[in-house]
């Protein structure tokens, strides 16, 4: 029985999943919008939202926790200098998932996941 087993397996072992979501979270922080499959986007929300909440209060301990999850100093710097202050007044709900059709090769449902309140010039260049 799979009672109380949360999260998607995505046909990967646990270390592959952890590495994949760490990389995807780093990409989302860097580019503020990424295109991926819908199940991965929904699961990425569970990784990125606590990171942004952590970045709202800047401390050495929080920076170390964020680095442990992303393993990238540039991403940690952007989290705490740009994204934390940007979302300081917002109580959660930092990401938006927009469905964008199906992938041509295997008809997998695709989606964009983006950070809300993104600067307008980046939104125009992503299109």
From Swiss-Prot:
A Pfam family the protein falls into: Ribosomal_L17
Gene Ontology CC annotations of this record: cytosolic large ribosomal subunit
Alphabetic keyword roster: Ribonucleoprotein, Ribosomal protein
Membrane-spanning parts: none
Gene Ontology biological process terms, A to Z: translation
GO molecular function terms noted in the UniProt entry: structural constituent of ribosome
UniProt superkingdom: Bacteria
InterPro entries cross-referenced by the UniProt entry: Ribosomal_bL17, Ribosomal_bL17_CS, Ribosomal_bL17_sf
PROSITE patterns: RIBOSOMAL_L17 (PS01167)
Signal peptide: none
Family: Belongs to the bacterial ribosomal protein bL17 family.
HAMAP family reported in the protein's UniProt record: Ribosomal_bL17 (MF_01368)
PANTHER family registered for this protein in UniProt: LARGE RIBOSOMAL SUBUNIT PROTEIN BL17M, RIBOSOMAL PROTEIN L17
Quaternary context: Part of the 50S ribosomal subunit. Contacts protein L32.
Name under which the protein is recorded: Large ribosomal subunit protein bL17
Originating species: Photobacterium profundum (strain SS9)
